Amino acid sequence: MRMQTKLIHGGISEDATTGAVSVPIYQTSTYRQDAIGCHKGYEYSRSGNPTRFALEELIADLEGGVKGFAFASGLAGIHAVFSLLQSGDHVLLGDDVYGGTFRLFNKVLVKNNLSCTIIDTSDLSQIKKAIKPNTKALYLETPSNPLLKITDLAQCAGVAKDHGLLTIVDNTFATPYYQNPLLLGADIVVHSGTKYLGGHSDVVAGLVTTNNEALAQEIAFFQNAIGGVLGPQDSWLLQRGIKTLALRMEAHQKNALCVAEFLEKHPKVEKVYYPGLPTHPQHELAKAQMRGFSGMLSFTLKNDSEATLFVESLKLFILGESLGGVESLVGIPALMTHACIPKVQREAAGIRDGLVRLSVGIEHEQDLLEDLEQAFAKIG
């Protein structure tokens, strides 16, 4: 089944009891049992809910996993995955990793005696050099947030397997429509379902899947034990969003390439980060590893001090957190999504105060270009 079809018919796409084409919202916290221990597959909605289960089956189907898991946020899912680790374990993280992931590790998981080394995961030699005897996991974002670095998943997964490490991939930017890390050797895939999968800025959710049965059993335990599960209403919204993912991603990518080409030629712009541009240093790798380049891009102005006025002058591009909705969003990562990362560390990774990140929506591309142009005019 091709991906466009699987997005609509994959997983559990209808209700077996009534034939309803849309999976019902099972708005219940508990379930009747015929006798002690005798139930119909569900006991309590933290442990399992039919609406959530349909979503979990869908993400597993889309990514090639054996089981999926839906959480109340992307970070809740990442927390559950990191709970697979033991006290004393060490993890490799990307130097421009999402700020929330960095904060989770640096402020919460360190209290469980977990440690990490921050490296450029797109550089295989840095990964090999950073592996320690107690290293247990390699955590990757590709494309990364916000510098859109591309990591060679097959090569990294091979190195990880040689050293007995788990390869965990945040596939939020690419989505299953453009990239399937499990098929390239990864062990676990995580998503912020809030972003492209939901696609309408109306739900906060996280998704996890794996193609390893033993890992699936462990993640299922932590999902239930920690309890950060997704409710039935949000599970239904996310399933509805996924049905149109193919159409939206094609539109996001078309507009993003148009915007990236416009910015690359603009005299006020110093550098554009978008893997769909032939000038991107890993453009060929992105073409080989992905089926498309998605709708995220970042760029730096020649004068960092003009970034705040520029983003505040935009009208169609909404100044705000998050990404992946049908509307275009703009932000300054150093002051917003990555503000929790120390300035020296941010700048060493290339996340300057003047770096602007765009989540390019599906509006008419000419309206977006005109909005950018009028904002450039405001900064003189």
Model-derived features: positions:
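PLP-dependent enzyme catalytic core of the Aspartate aminotransferase-like
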Residues: 115, 129, 133-136, 248, ...
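Glycine-rich phosphate/pyrophosphate-binding loop
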Residues: 25, 33-54, 58-61, 329-354
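N-terminal glycine-rich, Lys/His-bearing helix-loop that initiates the first secondary-structure elements
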Residues: 1-42, 49
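Conserved PLP-enzyme active-site core in the AAT-like
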Residues: 69-268, 273
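Conserved N-terminal alpha-helix of the aminotransferase class I/II PLP-enzyme fold
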Residues: 30-79, 83-84, 100-107
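Conserved small-domain helix->loop->beta segment predominantly found in fold-type I
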Residues: 257-321, 342-347, 380
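C-terminal core of ALDH-fold dehydrogenases
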Residues: 3-21, 305-345
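Short, well-ordered beta-strand elements within core beta-sheets of diverse protein domains
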Residues: 238-247, 294-302, 357-361
